Regions:
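Flexible coil segments in periplasmic/lumen-exposed cytochrome c-class electron-transfer proteins
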Residues: 118, 130-135
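Positively charged, low-complexity intrinsically disordered regions
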Residues: 7-8, 55, 130
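Solvent-exposed helix-loop boundary motif
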Residues: 21-118, 122
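C-terminal motif of bacterial Sec signal peptides marking the signal peptidase cleavage site
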Residues: 16-19
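Bacterial N-terminal signal peptides that target proteins for export
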Residues: 1-10
C-alpha cells in the first residue's frame, strides 16, 4: 500500500475517533448538567423527584438540585467558613461525594438501575472542576 494512501487512511481514522468524542463539545454549565443529565436520570426516574425524594434529595428543579448538591442557593456567594454541600465540593471533583456516587466508588453506584455513561460523568466532573457555577 503506498505511503500516501496509508497516511490518508490513518488521518481518516483519527478524524473519525475525534468526531466520536461528543463529550468535549457538550457544555459543562449547570443548566445542561441538570436538564440533560441529572433530571432525566435521577429525578424523572422517581427516585429524587419532589414527590419521591429519597434521602431528602430533590433533584427535580434546577434550584432545588443546586441547593442540595452544592449547599447554597444558586447565585448566592459562599460565606466565609460556610460548609460546602453534602455532594459537591466546588473545584474538587476528587473529593466530591457526587462523583463517588456516579462512579460507584466506595458506595452503591447512582443511578443504580442505569448508571450514567462515562461521557456524562466526565461532564459533571468538569462542571465541578470549574467551580460548580450555577449560571
Amino acid at each position: 500500500m503506498p505511503l500516501s494512501l496509508r497516511r490518508c487512511l490513518a488521518l481518516g481514522f483519527v478524524a473519525t475517533l475525534a468526531a466520536c468524542d461528543a463529550t468535549s463539545d457538550r457544555p459543562s454549565e449547570w443548566g445542561y448538567v441538570h436538564a440533560a443529565i441529572l433530571e432525566p436520570s435521577c429525578a424523572t426516574a422517581l427516585c429524587h423527584s419532589k414527590s419521591a425524594s429519597r434521602a431528602a434529595v430533590d433533584l427535580s428543579t434546577s434550584a432545588s438540585a443546586y441547593a442540595v448538591l452544592v449547599g447554597r442557593v444558586c447565585g448566592a456567594p459562599p460565606l466565609p467558613g460556610e460548609p460546602v454541600g453534602n455532594f459537591v465540593r466546588p473545584g474538587h471533583p476528587e473529593s466530591s461525594r457526587l462523583m463517588y456516587l456516579l462512579r460507584g466508588e466506595r458506595t452503591t453506584i447512582m443511578p443504580p438501575d442505569a448508571p450514567l455513561p462515562d461521557g456524562e460523568i466526565a461532564i459533571v466532573e468538569r462542571w465541578i472542576l470549574e467551580g460548580a457555577p450555577c449560571e
